[in-house]
Amino acid sequence: MAAQLDYPIPQRPSTTQLLTAFNSASVRWPGALRAGLAILLPGAIALLTGHDYAILLISTGAFTVIFGEGQPYRTRPRVMLTAGTALITVAAVGVLVGHLIFAPGHGHWWLLLAGLYSTALAAGCGFAQNALRLPPPGTFFLVMVGGGSVMLARTDVTVGQLLFWALTGMVASLILGMAPALFDPHGPERRAVASLEKAASAFQAGQDDSLARHHQAQTALFAAWQALSDAHIIRGGRIIDSQGAHLVERTLAAQHTIVAHNRALDLGSDSDQLTDHVTDVDPNRTAIPHTRPTGRYRLYRAAVQDSHAMVTTQKVVLSAIITVLVGLSLGFDRPDWGVVSAFLMLQWGPDHVPGTVRGIHRMLGSVVGVLLFSILHYFGINGWTLLLALAACQFCAEIFVAKNYAICVIFSTPLALLMGNSATRPLLPTIQARCGEILLSILIATAVLWLWQRSAPVRNQARLQVRAMESMATLLGLLFVNTPDSVLSARRDLQYELLSERRAIQSLAADNPDAVRQFWARHIALQHAGYFLLDFCTTHPDRTATREELDALVREIRAARAA
């Protein structure tokens, strides 16, 4: 009971706060400009050389630049090459599937293949982005490009043409994404820290909407630590690159400001409930964090029945399949559209209320987005006007993708419709069908969100608390014969398990406040013992623990186990 009084269970924000929340206050127009230029520049070359058909194909590869935004230049090429290769692959397979669907003599129900392909993409992408804990927009563009490319087969596009022009868009993205490194090689991490300081100051000085400002500050803090880690400035809770030490010091100062003001306002971790994409930041910590475990480790840890990533995948697949079957039965001709709509709502495995709000965002944003598409369609865009429309939508979607979901969808909706070659089809039937599929997918996804695997979060919480205990025991055993610096991987894994356990109990508190009470006291004890162990390692990195120190660590872990 004392633990619950000292660390109260987080309260769910109001629906109004969820509807109007801006998740990030960071400046995004430079990245948005690169995203627009990645379509505009190669598209202009295609038009000038007489290849008007290539504009949509270039767009599939031009999304590559989005995945590199915010990444330090040390890791950006690898991230962009991986994303670009994935985009081109799913687009090429989509065109092959489309040629089979639209072959002469094949009827309406052959579109089921498009739905199955899009569902398979959504399943794989949904699991990967949650297991790896990717930042927004996650893998959404992979699903959108893969599903939409099926519809490109309605034209005379060949796989060879797609590969060439998509690769052109990818190369343009790589050049645009890496060009700033010539003038400002440490720009991404410097801007991440500057954004953090701005968010921390706004949180401290703000007189209203403190919950939203705290969430923005936490989001900026996570982005800053991640940038410093990817830039190899910090490792193992310490500075390893003295040239970047001033950035670490500024980040720590901002973190202290955020934590102190959060304690003064007694907000706790309530701001985590403002979004379905929770940041891996403990609101009470003021130390340099460890880096993330390897991708293989994160995927392996998520590959269990009741994990957040696995349950999210189940919800995505179930809602997508039902949407596809019902949509085709009603005569709709874009099953990929229904899958993408369901995926957008469920892709992060949201809690019940935030997920429902995301569905409302999808509905409101899509209606406005369809109206925007109608205006573009009315004026008969093609060639240069089509290129400008694609680039403008890409620019605006990138501006809002990490800020507000409803506004982002306003621009991603016409972008997806244009890429699916809907500009050449009759307007009224297209609008009716797309709005019908959106409504259908949101209703089905909402039902699945609330009804499927309702007890899984409880089982997952119990499992994660066991994992945290096991990770503490593993690290403690290693410290008997090793220095903390020689067991960095075990320290890193323990931090990951503590953050995972904390993240899960936040979700459980939002959806099932009665069930969370049985885990809360042990949650507090586990977090205290785990960080006590990690702080010892950070304080004494290069020597083995004494017998007295080991006894103190053992007492902390035993107390957590008994809680």
Q: Which role does the model predict for each range below?
A:
Residues 73-81, 159-161, 186-189, 353-361:
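Interfacial helix-loop-helix linkers and transmembrane-helix boundary segments
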Residues 81-101, 356-374:
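Membrane-helix boundary elements
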Residues 302-392:
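Core alpha-helical transmembrane segments of integral membrane proteins
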Residues 25-34, 53-59, 107-117, 306-313, ...:
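Hydrophobic alpha-helical transmembrane segments
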